[in-house]
A protein has these predicted regions:
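The feature captures the beta-strand-to-loop junction immediately N-terminal to the Walker
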Residues: 24-26
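Helix-to-loop junction immediately C-terminal to a conserved catalytic motif
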Residues: 39
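Conserved ABC transporter NBD signature motif
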Residues: 44-61, 200
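Catalytic Walker B motif of ABC-type/P-loop ATPase nucleotide-binding domains
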Residues: 143-147
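Helix N-cap at the start of a conserved alpha-helix in ABC-type nucleotide-binding domains
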Residues: 154-156
């Protein structure tokens, strides 16, 4: 809650490994707040988050989380290569089966001539790729994506969608958006953040008008409060 306003309440939900969940809600519905609670950036008034690893249930820690922001945050005084080297050096003990820096660049389709440029000279899409790349290297158990495709051009956005589909195994991926068509295109399951609670919207037919109308009605209802 913020200043006595309850943003999230009574959330009791299970996310399964190997799926991309679309967290759909209006702007201001609390999607980023939920992510910040999961990431421990915001302290919850009550409740806990748990994860099952190797058959053992335990509380989620910051080490479990990879967080891709809608506005990429990168150290602009470093080159792309320096940034990756720095990240890999400080996380050396936790990175499983590391590749070479150039292999990672190839994986993200970052051209050789761009790899030694300062990050401040990267486009928004390239900064977003770098932010995504460090989360790929870290291999988190839970990947949170806070509207990361909203301001990307069509080509980069499509590359990122294909990448997310290829990475979804062995982790929980939660993709927040207020754009319904994007959620339907990318995600395996749709979860509606509505009145501060999470609700699964059944996807019996992704193209059905009834399905879309149900989501729109719920979002409109929340907006009229």
């Amino acid at each position: 809650s913020f200043e006595k306003k309850e943003v999230l309440r009574d959330i009791d939900f299970t996310f399964d490994e190997g799926k991309i969940y679309g967290l759909l809600g209006r702007n201001g519905a609390g999607k980023t707040t939920l992510f910040n609670c999961l990431n421990r950036d915001i302290k919850t008034d009550s409740g806990n988050f748990y994860i099952d690893t190797d058959g053992v249930r335990r509380e989620v820690t910051a080490d479990d989380i990879g967080y891709v922001l809608s506005t990429p945050t990168v150290p602009e005084f470093l080159t792309g290569r320096e940034f990756l080297k720095f990240f890999m050096d400080i996380n050396e003990k936790s990175i499983k089966n590391p590749k070479s820096i150039d292999e990672y660049f190839e994986y993200m389709s970052i051209e050789p001539e761009d790899r030694d440029k300062l990050l401040k000279d990267y486009s928004h899409g390239m900064k977003n790729k770098m932010q995504m790349l460090i989360n790929i290297i870290a291999q988190p158990n839970i990947l949170l994506l806070d509207e990361p495709l909203t301001s990307l051009d069509v080509v980069v956005a499509e590359e990122m969608k294909q990448l997310l589909r290829s990475l979804k195994q062995n982790r929980i991926t939660i993709f927040s958006t207020h754009i319904m068509d994007l959620a339907l295109d990318l995600c395996d399951e749709i979860v509606l953040l509505h009145h501060g609670e999470l609700e699964v919207v059944e996807k019996t037919d992704l193209d059905s008008k009834e399905f879309k109308d149900k989501i729109i009605a719920a979002l409109r209802e929340e907006g009229n409060e």
